[in-house]
Amino acid sequence: IDLIPDLLVIPVENLKNTLWFDETNLPWIKPSPNIPDLETAIIYPGMCLLEATNLNEGRGTYKPFKQFGAPWIDKQELSIALNNLNLSGVTFKPVSYTPISIKGMSNNPRFKDEKCEGVELILTNRNAYNSVDIGIAALKTVKNLYPEKLKFNSDWMDKLWGESGLSYQL
C-alpha cells in the first residue's frame, strides 16, 4: 500500500466484552444473506472452510453453515464419527436435505436439486464452541471417511485460511 490513511479509533463507552450480541438488546442486522442469525455467525468462521471443497455447506437451505453434506455421504456414519470426537459445545445430528435456489440467499447452490446426506450442527454451549477447530475437525473427518470423494480447491482454501497448505495438511 503506497498511501496509508490516518486511522482514528473511537472507543465504545460501557462495552462489556463478556456479552454475546443477543445480550446487548441491539437489533440483529444480517452481515450477509447467508448469516441470518447469531448462531450462524458463531458457526461460520470454521464452517466457511467447506466453501473450498466439493461439499454443500448448507447453502440452498434455510440453515446455511449449520448443516453440510453431499450426495455421497452416509449421514449416520458421519454423525457417529463426528460425535465420537466429543467436541466441546456441539453435537451433530444426521440430516437429509435438498439444496434449492433461494432468492436473495443462494441462486445456484452446490448439488442444487440433488438429495444430500450430512449433519446439522447443534450448538450445546456457545461459550465452549471453537468454530475453527470444529471446521477443521469436520474436514478431517470427511476426508478420513471419504478420501476418494472429498475434493479441495487449494487456491480458495489458501485464501480462506490466510496462508497456503491447509488442504494438504488435512
For the regions a language model picked out, list residue spans one by one.
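Conserved functional hotspot residues or short segments at active or partner-binding sites
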Residues: G69-L170
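Conserved, well-structured core segments that form the ligand-binding/active-site neighborhood
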Residues: I1-E13
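Glycine-rich, aromatic-lined ligand/substrate-binding cores of catalytic
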Residues: L15-I100
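Short gly/pro-enriched beta-turn/loop segments at secondary-structure junctions
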Residues: D2-I4, G58-Y62, E114-C116
